[in-house]
Amino acid sequence: MSAKEAVAKRILELCEERNMAINALASSAGVSPSTIYSMLNSKSQNPGIVSIKKLCDGLDISIRQFFDSNLFDDLEQEIK
């Protein structure tokens, strides 16, 4: 799994745990829904750490908690 796929899956996982819609997350994180949807649909080549931090703020979690998931354990090599 690529890093961007893992980020997308983690966002969906966290929203599902909190019964939170993407639009609600966007509102609480201060980003547009299209920003999140582009991260989820792999249109964003590199979801930036600032965007991820805003989502973490909207989810009321730390960056460490965001990346504390088995999804990030065996990521494929990004340098080809």
Segments (PLM) and residue ranges:
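Recognition helix of helix-turn-helix/homeodomain-like DNA-binding domains
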Residues: 30-46
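A short, Lys/Arg-rich alpha-helix, primarily the initiator
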Residues: 1-21
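Short, basic-rich loop-to-helix N-cap that marks the start of a DNA-contacting helix
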Residues: 43-57
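The alpha-helix within a helix-turn-helix
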Residues: 15, 26, 56
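Short, charged recognition helix plus adjacent turn
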Residues: 38, 67-80
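Residues in the recognition helix of alpha-helical DNA-binding motifs
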Residues: 14, 28, 39, 69
